[in-house]
Amino acid sequence: MIKELRQKFNADFTKEKYDAYMAKLEALHPGALDFRNAETPVFVPKDFTAKMLGACEDIIDVIVDPKFISLTDRGIPANVKVPNENSHAEFIVFDFGICENEKGELEPQLIEMQGFPTLYAFQAFHSELTAEYANLPANFSAYLNGYTKETYTQLLKEIIVGDLNPENVILLEIFPEQQKTRIDFYCTEQLLGIKTVCLTKLIAEGNKLFYDNNGTKTEVKRIYNRLIFDDLQKQES
C-alpha cells in the first residue's frame, strides 16, 4: 500500500531470500509451522492504520458498554455459556478487508471479529523475522500505539500469567499436537513459560484441577483457553 516500499521490496525479492526467511520461521519450532506464510508483508500507511484503529475503537466502545451483555445474552447457546465470565473479552481480533469507496479512496471494511486469542506469541517472533527479511525501515513496525516486542510481551504476560507462578498457568487445548496453530502454543511457552495441556490430560480432584508437569502433579490456578467449543463438540460426536 506504500508504493515506494512495495517497489523496493519487489525489486529486491528473490526466491533464495524467501526460502531463507521460511527456514528461520521453521527453525523456531521444527515441524510445527503448519499454515501458509505470505511472501510479502503489507506496507500500511499511517492514514489507513488510523482508519482501522478508529473502526476498532468504535466497535470496542459498544462491547464495553454495560448494556452489551444483556443485549447479546440470548445469542449464546446455553450449552456453551461459561459461568463467572468477565465483563468483556481480554482478547479481540479484527479482520479487515481493504476496499475502495465511491471517492476512490481506500478504506477498511470489517470482515470478522472474534473475542478469542490467536497467534499472539508466534506473531512476536514472526514480526521480528519479517522485518529483517523485508529490510523494513527502522520507523516501521507491526506493533500499534507505540508498543514494542518487549512491552507487548510484558502486557501479554500480565494478562495471561498475572502475578501467578507460570507453572500454575496452562494453555488448554484439545489434542494440541494436532492443531494447525500449534506453533503458537510452543512460542507461548517460550515467551511466557506456561505449558500446553490437552483437555484429556487434566486431573480433577474435588474443585481443583492439576496436570502432570514433567512428573510433578501441579495445580492449575489459571487457564489460557485456546479450546474452541466447536472442536470439542466434534470430538464428542
Predicted regions and their residues:
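Preference for protein termini
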Residues: M1-S237
